[in-house]
């Protein structure tokens, strides 16, 4: 089971509830919210700019599919950004904690 970071952008007003839902469902061990992000993107033929919050969810590759489905269900965007990045290395005790928090039989 490998640890991953999942990057998700969301409107500032939706981000805290989304983060809490992912942690409560044990789909992520932790979600950092980085407010104040400005995104520039092309949508439906137009260049757009929007203020967003970046969510960085720590989870495992085994939980990614369920996390993605939860984000798609809860997210206000028609096409939310959900990007997984593999972790090559991490502080071993932190990695153990992360894995335990998204397991079916978590430790405290």
Predicted features along the sequence, with ranges:
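Positively charged, small/polar-rich N-terminal and surface patches that mediate targeting and assembly
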Residues: 1-108
């Amino acid at each position: 089971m490998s640890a991953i970071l999942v990057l998700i952008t969301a409107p500032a007003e939706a981000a805290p509830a989304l983060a809490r839902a992912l942690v409560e469902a044990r789909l992520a061990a932790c979600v950092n919210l980085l407010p104040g992000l400005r995104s520039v993107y092309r949508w439906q033929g137009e260049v757009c700019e929007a203020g967003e919050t970046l969510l960085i969810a720590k989870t495992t590759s085994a939980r990614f599919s369920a996390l993605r489905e939860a984000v798609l269900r809860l997210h206000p965007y028609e096409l939310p950004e959900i990007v997984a990045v593999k972790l090559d290395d991490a502080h071993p005790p932190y990695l153990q904690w992360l894995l335990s928090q998204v397991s079916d039989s978590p430790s405290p």
